[in-house]
């Protein structure tokens, strides 16, 4: 086994070479049927694998010779305890590794898939979202810089549409549809899953849209690099850093990231207001309602709202006879 790992004896496929070939092919498909964010994920995996192999095996690359899960187990431990990555990030890297190796096996590049029966399931993190009161604090709160104001607007737009950062950044005017009665809708395809979704613009979202449109022109020209883009969106890293400053200034005691806007739409804006789970799932562009259930945590407020909606109706349909108490003495 040691000889196989170090590449002695029979000629075996090298793991990092396999990753390089995969990334090279993947890069040619970016903006066709793959995204740059996914490519970066695989490139990050390749970097972490290189560091791990050098640290643990004292070589620049290793071969995939025999089915052996110990490598995957050690790599998982390295990501968690040496790199200090979060559970969900570790899970993503392991899935990416398994995908590359499985593809090589299916294409006949390697004889066996050493990670076929290895699984790592991350604990589901607590979903962070804004309450109704916190949304109002964010809307009326004072911010110090123009970029903070713009980042807040972008975050709030996603709170009231359910868009992810990636879908907001690519949003163009072809995806904005106006019905004969004057209502605006977003009709697009999710960049991550390629699933079609449609969502109506609520008043706050419409107000933000109008704010970034030039009055004399139907199309927003703020985005000089691509004039068809609806909003001038900063990078995700910059937006997340800016959000930390904004919530402090608005008196919100939460460590927000941009994706919390999508969680807020799923919980506070829709499910807590009685929108059925299946409908929310369609608006979010989820393939399965089970994904929506993870985003939309049931809270006591949701339970109370649901009961309140049927309380009067049940009271009219079913009446239990009351008895008068007899006087004592």
Residue ranges and their predicted role:
Residues 129, 190-194, 236, 284-309:
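Catalytic-site neighborhood detector that most strongly recognizes the C-terminal catalytic loop/helix
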Residues 175-181, 253-254, 274-294, 305, ...:
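Short, polar N-cap/turn motifs at the start of nucleic acid-interacting alpha helices
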């Amino acid at each position: 086994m040691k000889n196989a790992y170090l590449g002695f004896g029979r000629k075996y496929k090298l793991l990092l070479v396999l990753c390089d070939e995969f990334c090279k092919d993947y890069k040619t498909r970016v903006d066709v049927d793959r995204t740059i964010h996914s490519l970066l994920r695989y490139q990050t995996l390749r970097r972490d694998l290189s560091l791990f192999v050098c640290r643990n095996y004292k070589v620049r690359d290793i071969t995939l010779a025999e089915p052996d899960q110990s490598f995957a187990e050690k790599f998982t431990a390295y990501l968690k305890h040496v790199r200090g990555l979060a559970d969900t990030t570790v899970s993503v890297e392991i899935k990416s590794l398994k995908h590359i190796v499985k593809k090589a096996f299916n294409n006949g590049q390697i004889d066996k898939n050493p990670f076929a029966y290895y699984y790592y399931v991350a604990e589901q993190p607590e979903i962070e979202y804004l309450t109704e009161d916190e949304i109002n604090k964010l809307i009326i709160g004072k911010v110090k810089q123009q970029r903070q104001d713009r980042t807040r607007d972008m975050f709030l737009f996603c709170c009231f549409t359910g868009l992810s950062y990636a879908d907001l950044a690519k949003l163009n005017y072809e995806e904005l549809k106006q019905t004969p009665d004057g209502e605006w809708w977003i009709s697009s395809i999710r960049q991550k899953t390629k699933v079609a979704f449609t969502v109506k613009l609520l008043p706050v979202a419409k107000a933000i849209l109008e704010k970034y449109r030039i009055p004399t022109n139907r199309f927003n020209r703020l985005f000089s690099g691509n004039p068809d883009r609806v909003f001038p969106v900063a990078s995700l890293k910059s937006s997340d850093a800016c959000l930390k400053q904004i919530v402090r200034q608005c008196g919100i005691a939460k460590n927000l990231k941009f994706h919390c806007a999508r969680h807020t739409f799923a919980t506070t804006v829709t499910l807590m207001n009685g929108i059925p789970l299946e409908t929310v799932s369609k608006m979010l562009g989820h393939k399965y309602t089970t994904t929506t259930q993870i985003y939309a945590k049931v809270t006591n407020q949701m339970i109370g709202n649901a009961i309140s909606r049927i309380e009067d109706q049940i009271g009219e349909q079913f009446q239990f006879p009351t008895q008068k108490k007899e006087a004592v003495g």
